[in-house]
Each structure stands twice: as C-alpha cells, then as structure tokens.
Swiss-Prot record:
One of the GO biological process terms: rRNA processing
Protein name as annotated: Endoribonuclease YbeY
InterPro entries reported for this sequence: MetalPrtase_cat_dom_sf_prd, YbeY, YbeY_CS
Source species of the chain: Shewanella sp. (strain MR-4)
Keyword Zinc: yes
The protein's Enzyme Commission number: 3.1.-.-
Residues the record lists as binding Zn(2+): 114, 118, 124
GO cellular component terms, semicolon-separated: cytoplasm
Cofactors (names): Zn(2+)
Pfam families on file: YbeY
Gene encoding the protein: ybeY
Cofactor binding: number and manner: Binds 1 zinc ion.
GO molecular function: metalloendopeptidase activity; RNA endonuclease activity; zinc ion binding
Function: Single strand-specific metallo-endoribonuclease involved in late-stage 70S ribosome quality control and in maturation of the 3' terminus of the 16S rRNA.
Amino acid sequence: MSLDLALDVQYATASDYLPSEEQFALWVKTAIGNSMEQAELTIRIVDSRESQMLNSTYRGKDKPTNVLSFPFEAPPEIELPLLGDLVICATVVENEAREQDKTLEAHWAHMVVHGCLHLLGYDHIEDEEAEEMESLETQLIESLGFTDPYKEQ
C-alpha cells in the first residue's frame, strides 16, 4: 500500500540548508508507513522567535525548540485524513546537528520522523513509551540510510 500524501511545506525562515519538499515527503512517508492510506500534513519551518512563541504558548516553555507537533483531532464520527502540523525551528535543528556531530540532513530527517510519530500518537514521557518510540525512530532513520540518532557520537 502506498501512502497518498498531501504535504504543505511552509518556509517561514531562511537558512543555509533547508530540505526540499521532496525530502520532507520521503521522510513523512517513511514515518507514517502503512498506518494510513491517506494523510494531509503541514510542515512549517520557522525561526527561533516563532518557535519560542509557540513553545511558550502551547508547552509553557519560554525557549525555542526543535519540533512541535500539533495533531488534528476530529470528532469520532468524522473521518478525515488530516494528520496535523509540524513546526520545526531551523536554527535549533542546525545548532543541535552541530553539537551532536550529525549532518544537517540526518538531523532534519530525524526531527520529521520524530514529529510524525508524535502525530501518530507516540510519546516519550514515560520510560517505556520513550524506549518504544526511540526504537521505532532508530529503525525508520536507519531505513533512510542514516545512523542511529540516539547513538553517542
């Protein structure tokens, strides 16, 4: 089964390296896999200011963050393929990639996969949930040809 993906990528900031819409689509399709036949998703690439504002408003943390996930929740009687929105801060992703000695492409892929898994209902608050989510992330990232994102460099 192939995922029918409607992806809207919004580039709301400039940077030396931002993935293409094709890269984002590949990473989203890899993360979603066979869990849905159709999916609609928006990925918004933002600067630190917008990320900090959203993180403060929705998570009570007054600092920019790498990725925020906003799942769409329709009433039970309504079936829509709308998965939700990801907001990714380019500056934070770049800084983390440098600090973790990863390529930008690998870290962007990881953030997209991580965010999509949140949209699918995965979480990492409890240790057991975190282990399950990280294991799945690692499998997906490695299937894309990147190394384990949680392996110490």
